[in-house]
A protein has these predicted regions:
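Conserved beta-propeller blade signature
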Residues: 106-108, 180-183, 232-236, 288-292, ...
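Beta-propeller domain segments
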Residues: 36-81, 118-119, 126-137, 141, ...
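Surface loop/turn motifs at the tips and blade-to-blade linkers of beta-strand repeat domains
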Residues: 90-92, 163-168, 208-216, 270-273, ...
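Asp-box/WD-like beta-propeller blade repeats and closely related beta-sheet repeat scaffolds
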Residues: 160-179, 185-227
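Short loop/turn segments immediately following the C-termini of beta-strands
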Residues: 112, 186-188, 194, 238-240, ...
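Blade-level signature of beta-propeller repeat domains, shared across WD40, Kelch, NHL, RCC1
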Residues: 429-454
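C-terminal motif of bacterial Sec signal peptides marking the signal peptidase cleavage site
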Residues: 32-34
Length: 454
């Protein structure tokens, strides 16, 4: 179509074109929501240390099954497992995603979301995915701050809230080493001085190491955990794509856990082939590093399951060339038979598309003894599985330092009977009293789970 030079008709033409583009986007989103395949095996069959892995089911239109975000109405809350109770520790937050407990019991929360990206919404697929994420509650601007919450009277509810740090760049992971607080922004590992009991830090963060970012920054969250001696930081960095469709050169130092020297910022790959590792935790008995990983999409509701695994130095876990060890992903070209041959299967599978994000080992005494050494996991919930999976907090029992048994639901009810998401759990931590704290980025709440003594 050729536009005229008259001002008014041109504006009308542009407005008309935008209406058409919007209609096309709505139609594409509706088609995605109504089409796609469904799971062929029960979710339970794809969980554990010997999961069923059906054949890939690639479809022209990927499966989309969104739980629209609506938040919690007054007086409502998630449902705690028998023997537990839950209440709001803090509400009215701005997209709280990650948590860190300080030695004095104060709780840090990263109020954050994805940074703006030049390529957001480009093309029909990009526009549709942007629409999907907004509907799922992930479309809010980033507050770019870390807030401090304090329960001064010990009643299980935060009675003081302060902005500890602001002006950050999509912060996520936090780790305290002596008097230094490390923050993982979406593009850099930063550090600020910390004084015990401080409620505000005005010192400008100092750069420790630049992290993979760039114009795509597909998986933007960066988590960080310190070694026991404080000499090294371990940073979880997700991939820049689903299965390297942006080119393998865009994946440098991504889909990996990086090891950073605390004194000079020197950095190296600790382990690779982990599509989107998020939660990081040291096992309290063995001292091994563990992570939860979000696996790849668009080969069906049954594949590929997210997982929990110990992380070995120098190990390769398959992405993008294979999954669950040496199951080759035929979409990736050129293939790498040498890397596939070395790929390690994860220790424990959590289920397809559950979006496992939070990870915390229990090493306290409020909960019964059988929870000691086991893992609590925040499952943010699927957007591309029929039926949905995740949207809950689970506990994975451990024995002798390894997962042992089927996951137990600890906190459910995040999706209502109409299929709407009242909340979505993300980060999980154990507070100084031994209660479990859960960040809910759709409900804008931090939930506190306690055990009721008999």
């Amino acid at each position: 179509m050729q536009w005229t030079t008259a001002t008014t008709p041109r504006r009308l033409g542009l407005a008309h074109r935008r209406r058409i583009e919007h209609a096309v986007l709505l139609l594409a989103t509706a088609l995605l929501a109504s089409c796609g395949e469904s799971a062929t095996i029960p979710l339970r069959a794809g969980i554990g240390d010997a999961p069923q892995l059906p054949k890939p089911n690639s479809t022209l239109i990927p499966t989309v099954n969104i739980a629209p975000a609506i938040g919690w109405s007054d007086g409502t809350a998630p449902t705690a497992a028998a023997g537990f109770q839950v209440r709001a520790f803090a509400a009215g937050l701005d997209h709280p995603r990650w948590l860190h407990v300080l030695p004095n019991g104060d709780v840090l929360v990263a109020e954050t979301n994805a940074p703006s990206k030049p390529q957001d919404g480009q093309g029909i697929k990009g526009a549709v995915m942007e629409s999907v994420m907004k509907k799922a509650g992930a479309g809010v601007p980033s507050a770019n701050r870390i807030s401090l919450l304090r329960d001064a009277d010990g009643d299980g509810v935060a009675d003081m809230r302060s902005v500890l740090l602001d002006g950050l760049n999509s912060p996520f992971g936090m780790s305290l080493v002596d008097d230094r607080l490390y923050i993982a922004n979406s593009d850099a590992l930063m550090v600020v001085p910390y004084r015990n009991g401080a409620t505000r830090i005005d010192t400008a963060p100092r750069l420790v190491a630049a992290l993979p970012a760039g114009p795509i920054n597909h998986h933007w969250t960066k988590n960080v955990i310190a070694s026991a001696d404080g000499l090294h930081l371990y940073v979880a960095v997700g991939s820049n794509s689903n299965v390297a469709e942006n080119g393998i050169e865009a994946e440098q130092n991504r889909a990996a856990i990086l090891e950073v020297d605390a004194d000079d910022g020197d950095m190296r790959v600790f382990a690779s082939g982990l599509r989107n590792p998020v939660g990081l935790a040291w096992h309290p008995t063995t001292g091994a590093l563990w992570t939860v990983v979000n696996e790849r999409d668009e080969i069906g509701s049954d594949l590929v399951p997210d997982y929990l695994t110990s992380v070995r130095r120098g190990a390769f876990y398959g992405w993008p060339y294979s999954y669950y060890g040496q199951h080759v992903d035929m979409r990736v070209a050129p293939s790498r038979a040498d890397l596939v041959a070395s790929a390690i299967a994860p220790d424990y599978v959590l289920g397809a598309h559950v979006a496992a994000l939070g990870l915390a080992f229990y090493d306290s005494e409020m909960f019964p003894a059988r929870y000691r050494g086991g893992a609590f996991i925040g499952e943010h919930g699927s957007w591309n599985r029929k039926p949905r999976s995740g949207y809950k907090v689970v506990f994975v029992p451990f024995a002798n330092g390894k997962p042992n048994g089927y996951p137990e639901d600890i906190l459910t009810g995040f999706v209502d009977s109409g299929g709407n998401a009242r909340g979505r759990p993300v980060g999980v931590v154990v507070d100084r009293q031994g209660a479990l704290l859960v960040a809910d980025d759709v409900g804008n709440t931090i939930w506190r789970v306690t055990h009721m003594p008999r």
